[in-house]
Amino acid sequence: MIRISLTSIILVMLVSCKSMDDSQISIYLEKSSSYKAQITRDVWGVPHVYGKTDADAAFGLAYAHAEDDFKNIAENMYLYRAEMGLKDGIDGAIQDYLIKVLKIREQIDENYTNDLNADVRKVIEAYAAGINYWMIKNPSNGYNHFFPVTEKDIVAGFSIQNLFFSGVVSSIEKLQRESDLKEEYTSLYRNQEFVTGSNVLAVNSRKTHDQSTRIIINSHQPLDGPLAWYEAHVRSDEGWNMMGGLFPGSPFVFVGFNENIAWGFTVNKPDLSDSYLLEVNPENENQYLLDGEWVDFKIEMVRLPIKLFGPLKWTVKREAKYSVHGPVLEVADKSYALRFSGMSDIKQVNQWYAMNKSNSLEEWLEAMKMRSIISFNGVYADRKDNIYFLHNSSSPLRKEGID
């Protein structure tokens, strides 16, 4: 729980109707002028975006998506910037706390240039420029306080997706539930866990009457919110030619097809996260037992902006503790350190780009071997009659005998 005290609250004005700065507008108009894209729409309104380069196409994709569904793109920025408290109050600040404790934005700042390929950075930066160009052209969009959207906002979206699919959020919720129960009843929750996910079906010529290869993808996505599918076709002269579904704020197709291959994903929920029960020094709550010795937690302060009412917000300061295992979560009278696969990895963007540029089973599998996308079942089909199932999991190597 986030506790609010008068000494930790700063009352400030929230200017929700902030206008864009003229000097910034000039800067981002100049950036936008380096991209050229063509957007045409079919009878269903689906955008078909063409650009000479991948970056041009990404710029056009962002503009088309903003044209159709800017609300979901913009509201994702609350999450990507760890400002959900400004949208949902205390409940949103809990998500912000987790994102800030995990230092997701700091990792992106530190590793953006070294970990992301130059071609990938060009695409991400062009996509952010496309969103900003649409905002400039539509100044009454209601979300000018997010201008300018940056390339690092876009990367944060991919890192946070990894967080949500790592199982660490479910682990935290389970620890909170169990803290309210007698110990003998906690095992009941293990039997209540179940997997809900998506469907993908691939069939080749061995099972079809007309000797065709087909893939059917039904990913059970909502029509609104951060996981709402958006359908688009994006094509460039650099070999990018994908049509399918993507999330708000994503420059890459997540499930779909090109002229040679197609793939879909389903949720598989491998065991990717661990919680370490720490023994805290009864005489010093800022120490824990490590290899027979009491050692100090690393302690930092996290600032969480929270919407109050009208144009008012609070900034709450909360302590964050770190052990050698990872950030520490205090549940009731117990302290747990959290760790999960991919918690410091921002290379998901590289992998999605490589998959989008794949044109054969070999290329697609090579992209999947990156394993920066830490979970999902992959189902694949191609024009050469290949079908393939991949249980994808970036599972940690654990020492045997440890619970």
Protein language model regions, located:
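C-terminal motif of bacterial Sec signal peptides marking the signal peptidase cleavage site
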Residues: V15-S16
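Mature extracytoplasmic enzyme cores
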Residues: D21-D403
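Bacterial N-terminal signal peptides that target proteins for export
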Residues: M1-L6
